[in-house]
Each structure stands twice: as C-alpha cells, then as structure tokens.
C-alpha cells in the first residue's frame, strides 16, 4: 500500500511516483486548488490536488482532518519562493493523481492546538500518540532499546528471559499479587525486579546476562515513576564493581553519542557521604553550582541558641547555602523559601544578604547578625566564599532535616534564579552507600536490597557493627536523576544469613521466602555483580521531557489507573469464585457502589 513514508520525501524523490498512507493533518482550499498536509509516523508532506485530475480532486473535497487515506502522486520540487524551511519535507510536494479514503473521522475529542489536560490525553491516548512529538519520543525509545541490545550482544551478554509469575519477596515496595486458580489460597507476585533470578543465572554459569524487562511495584507514584516500568537489567560473574561500572559507563556514553551527538566524557565518582554533605542529595545535580557548607564549628559558642544547640549536638547540623546574586530576593520571596523548607521538616531559614563584601560585617544585612558577632560573620563569609550581591541561607536542626531541607532548597533556587545550567549533561557515579538505614521502628532496613554485599568486612565483623558497614553499591546519576543502580552481590551463605538476621528475618522466614537462594549458595556460587537502568527514565532524559508518562505508550496516572481502558476494574463474580477470593470491607462497598 505504501512505497515511502511522508516524512522521508526529499529532493532525491523528485519526478518519482509514490504511494503514501497516513492521515490528514490539515486541509485548506486556495485558489481552486486543494492542499493537505499528510502525516504518518515519520512526519508531514504537502499534497495538492489539481482540478484537472477530476476524480482525485472530487474525493479531496470530502477530506477532513484525521481522515485516514492512501494516495498516489508525483513528487515535485517546490518553487524557491514556496519552500517551507520549518518542514523537513518543505522542499518538495506531491501532486496527487489517485486518492482512496480508507476511513473517515469524527471531530476529535482533543484540541488540535494541544490545549488538553493530561487526563484528556490519557483518556484518548491513541489520538494523543498521533502527535508528532509523541511519535518522535516513542521512535527514540525504540532506537535506544535497539542500541542497547546491539551493545550488549557485542560485549558477550546473553539476553535471557526470567519469569513474570514468581514468589513474593521483600524488595522495598509492595508486590502486585496474582491469585492462583489451581493452588487455592496461594498467590504469585509480579516481579519488582529479576534480582534473584539473575543471581541464580550467575550460579548457573551464564556469566554475562541482560534483559530489557517489565517490572512492577505497588508504590506511591511521582512524575518519574510508574507501577509498571521497564529496566535494562544486567548481571555479571567474575567482574569487580569497577569493571561493571566501566562497561555500563561505556554503554551510556555510547548511547548518548548515538542519540544526542554529545560525548559525556569520563564520569566522576563521589561517595554517598560527600554527596549528602555537599549537595543534600544522593543523586546530586552537578549542573547547579551551589553547595552546602558546614558552619557548626563556627557557631558553637554564639548566643543564638537556634544555631548553638544543634552545633553542639552530635546528631545536629548547622549548614549554609550561598546563593550567587540572591541578595535581589525580596523579603516576601525569602519568607516563601522559608515555608518551602518547612516541607522537609525545617523550622524555617535564617539568612544573610551580602551587600558589600569588602565592608565586612557592616556590608551584610541579616536579622541574626547581631547574635553572631563580627568575627563569626567574617568567618562565615570566608568559608562560604561570599561575594557582593549574594545571599546565604542557614538551616540548623537534626542532620537529616538540614540536609534534606537545604538540598531541596538548592535545587529550587537553582531553577528559580537560573543558576542551574540546563543545556549541559552532568553524569556521575555515587558510591559507598551505607549498608543499612533506620527503618523508623527501631530496626534496620537495607539501603539498597538485602542481597548487596558489604565492602571489606566478613560476616562476623558485619554482625558486630552493622550500622558502620559500607555497601559495595553504586548509582549512576545524570542531571539529578538516578538512571541506574547496582551492587556487588552476596555470594556466600553465611554472609547472606547474617544480613537477613540484621534485618530481623528469622531462620524460619528465611527458609520460607529465600530457601531456594540459600540452597543455591551452597553449590559453588561465583562472585557476581550487576546493575539495572530505568529505561523509561533514560528515554525521558534523552527526549527532553520531565514526565515519564510522555515516553510510555500507554501509561498509568499517579493514581495507578488507566483512563483509557478504565483499569483496574471490578472482578467478575464467577472469576472471583474460581479463585476462591471474597472481596470484603471497603473493597466490597466500592464494588457494590460501582455496580449499582
């Protein structure tokens, strides 16, 4: 039906007869001629209908936007005065000789000027995907997947599929459960990742594995998260963490060069502790020049207790954030930033404007200056590198509150004041994460997952001091987004059982949930390490959008709903009975109300 795509026509096709298939993007009548912009997945081309071609011209009079059609025509060069430089095909046009209307279209429920809410776009996603920007994003996604496969194949990795119906294991989020009809009362879980299966593949002797795979997590959603998402999943045997990072960095560097033409260069490394101390985040955006600066030692003895109390507390922190040019901020704006910091637990912000640096304390403006004294103020100005027209924000509280609040403020100010350089890429590796973190209930949780190996300690040493252990883990960060994360895995049974014990997983629960893994660790398990990239997030970055739903063909909302198909839906009564499932409580009420 088609010999070439609309968007691929150029001057090399002049004089050729072509067959095109697509949609009417726009129709217009000009001086007895009918013109349409015809669209397919590759782009637009102008088609015109001459009254001398009576059959085609008569049919063209019936055309309306979004009619689906096939036509035959002759490619012609446009006169120089009519070349459209804003269209990729703007140097040519097609004189239609035959026209077939395949299907008509009702007026679209979406605004052609793109003044549509996201809910409208998701409700009529099949129409939203006709937009060139959406088509381009999905084409880029396909290019990325294809490039990854070629790279991994060339590096000797095997593409091996792992099960979608598996066993529920604690990996940090809630599982999506699938009831078994055959095994009454039992449930499969959709995998949060192929983590354990890829480790088992290493134990099976497949030393280089990869997979582009769907994963599922029942968690609260954000703009860059979905309940079902796609990972580029990788695992290796007999490779160190450094070697894994080298291969994966090369993959991303080559991918960026392929898609954007940009060379990312060698990725710097930063420890987790440095990232949190300097940037208030374990995924720092290095395009933003601002850094957090500790000043607790300078304010331990001041009369201002808001500063001195946390400065003398081992669990406290007093830090400053210098904002270049920030002295322009009004008092109202400063107060708004103080309220913003309260979202992250801070009790507000102290501030100091630097109007004339050379004048020392006389050149600053601050409601807390009188409590600090000239010597402390000068020390703060020196340490922060303050200059004329800067403002310095201060936060004093528990370490995590100060770090979170100033880290978030740094990002917001960077964008608000245009300090973040948005037209560059800033990749890095963050390494040496804590092995464990507090779970909020007096216990410990794995910072990554419970299969991550610690660095430089054996099982006995780990059990003796778990909170000081450093994980042999690493995250790749680009422009403030964690695009991938991985670790060296535990390959000894005693270490794995020790980690389970630290996480308060008793021996019975270990056997119930991980018995197959503990058994496998008895049979000559090789050292292994891996990583997983979020494909959706990579595509989001490479296509310049900030919403992951823009790069998934049929995404869910932030409420994990599909507005087009109206999923999830209530279960059929007979199907529920076959599965031995009874809906109770609020679910029962919702089901009855939904069907009434």
Swiss-Prot record:
UniProt entry tagged with the keyword Disulfide bond: no
BP-aspect Gene Ontology terms: aspartyl-tRNA aminoacylation
Keyword terms, alphabetized: Aminoacyl-tRNA synthetase, ATP-binding, Cytoplasm, Ligase, Nucleotide-binding, Protein biosynthesis
One MF annotation (Gene Ontology) recorded for this entry: ATP binding
CDD domains: AspRS_core, EcAspRS_like_N
Catalytic activity: tRNA(Asp) + L-aspartate + ATP = L-aspartyl-tRNA(Asp) + AMP + diphosphate
Cellular compartments annotated: Cytoplasm
Enzyme Commission number, as recorded: 6.1.1.12
First-listed, main subcellular location of the protein, grouped into a coarse class: cytoplasm
Residues given in the record as ATP binding sites: 217-219, 226, 482, 534-537
Pfam families to which the protein is assigned, alphabetical: GAD (PF02938), tRNA-synt_2 (PF00152), tRNA_anti-codon (PF01336)
Binding locations of L-aspartate: 171, 217, 448, 489
Cellular component aspect of the GO annotation: cytoplasm
InterPro entries listed in its UniProt record: Aa-tRNA-synt_II, aa-tRNA-synth_II, aa-tRNA-synth_II/BPL/LPL, Asp-tRNA-ligase_1, Asp-tRNA-ligase_1_N, Asp/Asn-tRNA-synth_IIb, AspRS_core, GAD-like_sf
Aspartate: annotated segments: 195-198
Enzyme type, top EC level: ligase
Family affiliation: Belongs to the class-II aminoacyl-tRNA synthetase family. Type 1 subfamily.
Known function: Catalyzes the attachment of L-aspartate to tRNA(Asp) in a two-step reaction: L-aspartate is first activated by ATP to form Asp-AMP and then transferred to the acceptor end of tRNA(Asp).
PANTHER family (UniProt xref): ASPARTATE--TRNA LIGASE, MITOCHONDRIAL (PTHR22594:SF5), ASPARTYL/LYSYL-TRNA SYNTHETASE (PTHR22594)
Subunit and partners: Homodimer.
Protein name: Aspartate--tRNA ligase
Gene responsible for this protein: aspS
């Amino acid at each position: 039906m088609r010999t070439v795509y609309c968007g691929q026509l150029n001057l090399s096709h002049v004089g050729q007869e072509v067959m095109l298939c697509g949609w009417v993007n726009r129709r217009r009548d000009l001086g007895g001629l009918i013109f349409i912009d015809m669209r397919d997945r590759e782009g637009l081309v102008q088609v015109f209908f001459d009254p001398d071609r009576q059959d085609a011209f008569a049919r063209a009079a019936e055309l309306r936007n979004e009619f689906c059609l096939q036509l035959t025509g002759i490619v012609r060069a446009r006169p120089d005065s009519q070349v459209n430089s804003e269209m990729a095909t703007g140097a040519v046009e097609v004189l239609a000789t035959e026209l077939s209307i395949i299907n008509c279209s009702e007026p679209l429920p979406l605004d052609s000027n793109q003044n549509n809410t996201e809910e409208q776009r998701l409700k009529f996603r099949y129409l939203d995907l006709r937009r060139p920007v959406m088509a381009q994003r999905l084409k880029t996604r396909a290019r990325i997947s294809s490039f990854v496969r070629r790279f991994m194949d060339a590096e000797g990795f095997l593409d091996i599929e792992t099960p979608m119906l598996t066993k529920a294991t604690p990996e940090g989020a809630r599982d999506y459960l699938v009831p078994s009809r055959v095994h009454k009362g039992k449930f499969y879980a959709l995998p949060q990742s192929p983590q354990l299966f890829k480790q088992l593949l290493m134990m099976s002797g497949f030393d280089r594995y990869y997979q582009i795979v769907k994963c599922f997590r029942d968690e609260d959603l954000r703009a860059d998260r979905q309940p079902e998402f796609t990972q580029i999943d990788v695992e290796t045997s007999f490779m160190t963490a450094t070697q894994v990072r080298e291969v994966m960095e090369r993959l991303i560097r080559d991918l960026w060069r392929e898609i954007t033409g940009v060379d990312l260069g060698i990725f710097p490394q930063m420890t987790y502790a440095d990232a949190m101390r300097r940037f208030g985040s374990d995924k720092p955006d290095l395009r933003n020049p601002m850094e957090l600066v500790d000043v607790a030692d300078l304010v331990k003895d001041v009369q201002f207790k808001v500063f001195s109390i946390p400065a003398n507390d081992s669990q406290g922190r007093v830090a400053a954030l210098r904002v270049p040019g920030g002295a322009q901020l009004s008092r109202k704006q400063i107060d708004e930033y103080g309220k913003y910091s309260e979202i992250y637990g801070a009790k507000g912000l102290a501030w100091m404007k630097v109007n004339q640096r050379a004048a020392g304390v006389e050149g600053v403006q601050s409601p807390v200056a009188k409590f600090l004294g000239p010597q402390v103020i000068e020390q703060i100005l020196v340490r922060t590198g303050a200059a004329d027209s800067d403002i310095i924000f201060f936060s004093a509280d528990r370490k995590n509150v100060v770090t979170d609040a100033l880290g978030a403020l740094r990002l917001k100010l960077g964008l608000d004041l245009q300090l973040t350089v948005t037209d560059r890429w800033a990749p890095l590796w963050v390494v040496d994460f804590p092995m464990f973190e507090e779970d909020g209930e007096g216990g410990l949780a794995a910072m990554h997952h419970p299969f991550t190996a610690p660095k430089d300690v054996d099982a006995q040493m780990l059990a003796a001091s778990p909170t000081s252990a450093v994980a042999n883990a690493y995250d790749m960060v680009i422009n403030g987004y964690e695009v991938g994360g991985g670790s060296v895995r535990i390959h000894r049974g005693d270490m794995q059982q020790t980690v389970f014990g630290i996480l308060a997983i008793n021996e019975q629960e270990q056997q119930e949930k991980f018995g197959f893994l503990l058994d496998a660790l008895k049979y000559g398990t090789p050292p292994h390490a891996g990583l997983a990239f979020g494909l959706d997030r990579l595509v989001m970055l490479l296509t310049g959008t900030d919403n992951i739903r823009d790069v998934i063909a049929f995404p869910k909302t932030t409420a994990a709903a599909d507005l087009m198909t109206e999923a999830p839906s209530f279960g059929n009564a007979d199907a529920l009975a076959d599965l031995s499932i009874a809906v109770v409580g609020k679910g029962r009420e919702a089901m009855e109300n939904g069907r009434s």
